């Protein structure tokens, strides 16, 4: 029986594994026949409707937590409104009480809410390939793991036989080829699962074979031994030896790209290839339209399937790769320049080890995690480093009714908790849920990063910004603070300090709040904007060298409306309570950030959301950041345009529903058939309330609140709808907690700032 475990492990940890979540199969646990039937039914239901509803609802976790929390939760009678005219405080309060009561049963004793943070389909194949080439596949993944992974891959195969970049996307060569390879490595036959693999293979071959897989796929297939390294564009490790003052030094890249291409350059420099087995030999025949030994690998370097191509290579980039491939690489293989290659490899592996140890072998993200692991195995298969990598794989795996997947992080723990606290505090029910807030507050207090790095080295030696005082997206073991995570957690700490300690626990030490403020101030760029993890270190023109055809805007850490707005709001809250600490610097920071937000507003009044879908998300942040700096509907044309934009997108139903295609195409796109989405609706409702819509015409707010109330399920939960997170323009990701958090937050604000004010 599968069980979800929390805060356990023998591995090193900064806070006794607080926030850790992983699934484990226990053969000694025997579920009842009723439990088996429930699990079977939810899994079978997902399979039946897999082409209509691509997103799982985290029902396996919900079943377990419901059982762990004892008897059925008693809820008030559900409210359903026939129209907004029936709206009342009682209806809103009943819905909120039902929602928070249900959501509180999903909270762990550690204070966080576990959940699915998957969605991209290129992550799991990388893990399967990485474990295969290190000869650890069957050791690390039990037959139960492998069975659930196969189920996940088949559940997300599109009707045309391929797999998308993410669960809602159209089929791509990258994920079709990698998923096909993964299923073969997981034991499936060539025509397995009633011809599903045969259909996938036909999809690949009909498009010219796997030679047109994008660059990340070329690397993984080369590592596996079913694609030649000569068919890759160069990733020379020597680039890490360049002077840092050069704009194209990799230390100036966005950290996620930097930490992925660091170990990739090691594997490229070593020309690493895993063991050649009969399955590898067979795959060399299955994936291509020509005999393997006759493929023109040099020509294949520049091939990319049209289904995958989001950011085409520039001519400058292709000229650069051609020059390095034809001139640089042959020279670097010969003495004495071969010594330079070895020096570069030594430099890179040293940085890999620093990242591993600094993050307790979690690494920044799932791609770098697996590539780092392969590098450590190549260096020494019996090393402690490889063993410690293996022990952290389960942190990235998540099980739901659609199968076992690899997440985009090892969870979104801190991020979800920070929003959940703000949502509950926004309601008029705080006193009823003090124990929930206390546990969540403790989690926030114990999740702050309290060090600047591993050991006594200067973080800049490893191309890192200071981290002390920040908060990460997940847990402090990750050790990568994020600007908006730090801002949101700071806001929570300030909010909790204003509430009775008997209800929510003791406030954070003021010195720790100072550390957070210091970090936020240090992250502001010269133009006033805030990026995600670090300062922006290079220039936008570097994007012309973006080698990842499947993503956009990955070369530098750009400034975002979300991060900039969060910084403004939280610094204002801090300054209100602690006006003596760096007041002038905070005021200047807020003013510059507000000016930046105004400069990046779109002509139609919206803001592009880079981390949520999409214009409703970005516009919510844009509005609340400007309001925090004193802008109002009356004195700000920017706010008036933003308000008009949101109102223009409201659907006849009263809600908002935005497709992931908005982010992909950079044009606002409704969901199919005019469907509303509870999270988009919540963001829009929050934004309009913040912009003072209630004082002008509350009717759109009543309509939106009606949609949210009528969307609530019988048990107090809210339905999982289309995927709502995004990154790098083209790929979506799950924020499974949003379906609970944001309806609570929006209805809470609506009750207190619209209905009660009308009275």
Swiss-Prot record:
Pfam families: SQHop_cyclase_C (PF13243), SQHop_cyclase_N (PF13249). Its EC number is 5.4.99.-. Keywords: Isomerase, Repeat. The active site is at 484 (proton donor). The keyword Ion transport does not apply. PFTB repeats lie at residues 146-187, 437-483, 513-554, 590-630, 639-680. One of its GO terms (biological process) is triterpenoid biosynthetic process. GO terms for molecular function: oxidosqualene cyclase activity. NCBIfam families: squalene_cyclas. This is Probable oxidosqualene cyclase. It comes from Cucurbita pepo. The lineage of its organism: Eukaryota, Viridiplantae, Streptophyta, Embryophyta, Tracheophyta. The gene is CPR.
